[in-house]
Amino acid sequence: MFNVSSPCVMLASSCSVKNEQIWRCLTRPTCSAPAFPAGRITALQALDVWKRHFVENGVTEPEQSSQYIIAHLLGAKTIESVEQQRLAEFLSKEETQQVWRLCSKRLSRMPVQFVIEEWDFRDLTLKMRPPVFIPRPETEELVELVLTDLQNHPGSTETPPTCLEVGCGSGAISLSLLKSLPQLEAFALERSQDAVDLSRENASRLGLQDRLKVYHMDVIKDAEQMPGLFSSISVLVSNPPYLFSEDMATLEPEISRFEDRAALDGGEDGLNVIRQILTLAPDFLSNRGRIYLEVDPRHPALIRRWVEDNVEELRFVETRQDVSGKPRFCILQKEESHKAPEVDQD
């Protein structure tokens, strides 16, 4: 499986490839593609040529990169699903040109997802386009958390559950939830017009456009316009920008060059958008409605303390670990406020 890790684990300093290899392409405008073959070559030969060229130029995951691109051009998801006979056949001139064109994009450090313009998220195949944030495996785990809770606590049969996603990107979270829960209806907020358009396109391709309403709104800048738009929401879910600003300079070029920086940078402590979500959430959620956040492993303790000090209507329920054992997900719940009502002195 091609490793699409969260931005936190894709810092250049943590890559296993030598730093001088990683950054070689950054010292010049472009890396040159290998010479176009004079004669015909097979898919296996093309795989070998591009794997070696990616290695020589410090492209991360060189073998997987060439395999996914060439499998895509052969109409398959993975190279393992392509028949060996097909791999041993000569490529047509047009196919070879396509291999060189797409692999040259990867050579520029464009993520494979953007090169082939699609990617699988759980059981969905979604269109991908820069600069819209690419969903990571950790976010699939976030969806599983939400699904488990909604399936175990479906709520009233008379009132279908509703979900609000803040920062929907490609639509991966909302669309995955809608596909798994036929009774669910979803709303999404997204500041980027590129992401709004891509979410709507993915919803239409999956036949889910009638159950997902995407608003082109910034949760911080457009906060005053939001009251009344949403109420009695069962679940609020978000994979918000949560990187510490100081970490932005050390991101891999796949991220820093091609993905929307605003979808990554969470401010000095990574909590700018998260604090805003938690401030607004009580106005949107039904009583005992829940919030599910994907966060930096340094965040859960900070979020717990901040909520206790600033948002009386929310209770921090628990922190969940991701598959790597890192504290990655925060679950909170709206509770009835116990604050005494103000007494009119007149």
Task: Describe each region flagged by the PLM.
Residues 141-250:
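Conserved SAM/SAH cofactor-binding pocket of Class I
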Residues 336-346:
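Flexible, glycine-/basic-rich loop-and-beta segments that form/coincide
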Residues 16, 37-50, 61, 111:
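Short, structural beta-strand-to-alpha-helix junction motif
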Residues 1-38:
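N-terminal mitochondrial targeting presequence
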Residues 268-334:
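Conserved Class I SAM-dependent methyltransferase catalytic core
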Residues 69, 109, 139, 173, ...:
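Residue-level signal for inorganic ion chemistry
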